[in-house]
Amino acid sequence: MSSPIRNIAIIGATGQMGSEISKTLLQSGFNVTAIQRSDSTKTVPSGVKSIKLDLNDVSALTTAFQGQDAVISAAPDPIVLENQKPWIDAAVAAGVKRIVPSEYSTNVDSPLAEGLPIVVDKVRARRYLIEKITENGNNSSWMSVNNGPFFELVLGFGGLGPNFRSKTAKYHNGGDNLIGTTKISDVAETIAKVLRGEGGLYKEAENKSLYIHSAAVSEKQLTKMAEKVTGQKFEVQNFDVEEVYQNAKAKFAEGDRSVWIDFYYQMMYGKGYGGSEGFQEMSWNDKVGLKTMSDKEIEDGLRKAAQQAGMI
């Protein structure tokens, strides 16, 4: 490995995202430690060390981060800024070389992103992290990974075109706009490659957000593929993204959190948000050596989702 990273602490190491990152880092030869809540009963992946503590205790976290070269947050959504501050403060205080906040979203760098409840605290957490690194003046740096909707997860609940349980398909603004979607394993491997320092990636990714995608797909494309692999037709439902967004804002203001996902459609397809508009231009795929999925691989993913839903 041609980077200074050897020891890595992970917050959220037992979740779907965190466990994949942990396993990939272990396979890459890193020493991995899971930072868990004091009362956690979840089992960490084999080979991962566990430290249980109060995640709001900056002093305890700082001690836990001593000797760690990188800290990665794989905390699940929703991200709440106040819950991020203690570990960020501790990581910077401990002089951790590379700090990776939990983003894993679409275009968090868009000036409009902070207006969306679904990512506002991710935007603010990154800003807070940068401020702390600047204030401290040590050698800490940050990076983040943004990957669009997770391929396996979004197919499971019908968030990107076909819904295998209801046999419906949602098209937003016509359903033809491409968006980047990424396999969890590709996110994990990208992080590992950067921290290994392959091809100078460790330095190149310093203080940057890395945008990647396993596939560039549209809702209409996925629906047609779903019809092919299932042999069944999906009832198409058309939605105007701006109308969905305004409706979500009104309901969210009344305390309805069920509209949470509707804000993500604005992030993906809304004008000026840089989701479908700019993800390919921002892509780090070539730099990190990430090959996009073939049609067959996408169809295999759709087939698996259909089987899990009991459609085939």
Model-derived features with residue positions:
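Conserved Rossmann-fold cofactor-binding substructure of NAD(P)-dependent oxidoreductases
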Residues: K49-A70
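Oxidoreductase cofactor-interface core, primarily capturing Rossmann-like NAD(P)-dependent enzymes
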Residues: S2-P45, N56-S59, L81, A94, ...
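Short glycine-/small-residue-rich Rossmann-like dinucleotide-binding loops
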Residues: L55, P76, Y104
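NAD(P)-cofactor binding segment of oxidoreductase domains
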Residues: Q66-P101, D121-E131
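A hydrophobic C-terminal alpha-helical subdomain
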Residues: A205, E243-I312
